[in-house]
């Protein structure tokens, strides 16, 4: 006789499970799957941050050939999902590569305490101007020289939804925050020497060459990046998460599987790879010139970006 392995679940349990699912979906505002697609946020303020980001060119000058066409133009949309999912209102969210200022603007708008640091003075000044336009009189700090906004000797504090937004200028291999003080980290690391960021000699990937030395190797670049993520590990609370937005790239005709190459360096620190999300960029049109170059070089156009989720040990 054939056995019936079906188990009956009481209707009240099914109802409770569905109610909890709806509660979480209302909180997150998206289905938590491993493949994400571009969509607007349906929030006037957040959409304005997205439009502001695209209009003003908040990202470094990218070479289409380096990333085979994949540009991180929808970063604020990704940030909104990640911040809602991995943090709660009142949590401390930080970014050690502050050229991604939309991440912090989104975090602040969602009721998180947002802080960031960046080495590049030009990015820093651009970000300060952007934040001042959005949130007047924020605390603008310099972790090395201890002056405010390059002019005022006063510590300025202003509040948006009761939260402080602090921006620091300095090398992220030495973060200014205490051990186990942060709740979530969101960042997009530099792309070796494929993209020009600034002339600071401490700049990962290009700094030594700018200072007159030899250009670092790819492995030396990853070791330097490891020092930044070691600091992120230090300041993040046990059991909390970090999201790293990155993509693979080409340099000197060599394909670098950046998203995979980074993982062993992270695990050496103590990070646990918790998840990988694929962000689909297929709605971004390819430029005609670039399409013809893809055909000539037999490269596939990248229409995705990786989001690696790491977790600090409990």
Model-predicted segments: where are they?
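Class I S-adenosyl-L-methionine-dependent methyltransferase catalytic core
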Residues: 1-314
